[in-house]
Amino acid sequence: MRQQIQRGIRAALGLLLLLSVSGCGFTFSPEELYSLPQLPAEYTELNNCLNQVLESGAEYAAPVSGSNIQPVQLEDLDGDGAQEAVAFFRNSAEEKPLKIYIFTPRNDTYEQAAVIEGTGTSIYSIAYEDLDQDGQKELLVGWRVNTDMQALSVYSLRSGQPEELIQGTSYVRYAVNDLNQDGLWELVVLRADEENNGIADYYCWQEGEFQLRTSARITSTMA
């Protein structure tokens, strides 16, 4: 089992290095990057929900990295075929200024279902992955804590409200895949220790919980 985990970690590290070398991503024009999406007419009610958040003193704060950088994103989170709306805001007047609002479609309208709150300077990234293959996607949120640090949190919405499976672990990069071939997705997080040595943390499902299974020192530094 230990050898299988080590092989899985090496595979994930290879994937991370490949992505960093290839510069995997998308190219956008300045107009596409800085203009807000125009919602079609059928999303009028959603637009009203968004306006209520803006009128409360918030402003749009889209993720600054990765492929999902729109301030409002449509994603089927619960596997029912209907797309939830995920919207990103900052309200500087609040103790936790960074907000991720989740609106669910219901009877030709949208209702606020949940809010994820965080601290830091910005929302760094967002990814949607069904880690336990139950048909419902978890949210992997990167928070920019300061210019030198990012923190990764993983949230489940199974209960209707955000449940933090991984709580704000520092990271440089991460990858998800079914590394041990058990039908569930594992997570490998690359981070630096206090001496800036590279550490790979391996998270997997154990007894229904997403837990840190092991950590391994790697030769690369995390500068």
Residue ranges and their predicted role:
Residues M1-Q6:
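N-terminal secretory signal peptides that target proteins for export/translocation
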Residues R7-F28:
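Sec-dependent N-terminal signal peptides of Gram-positive bacterial secreted proteins and lipoproteins
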Residues C24-A223:
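Beta-propeller-forming repeat regions
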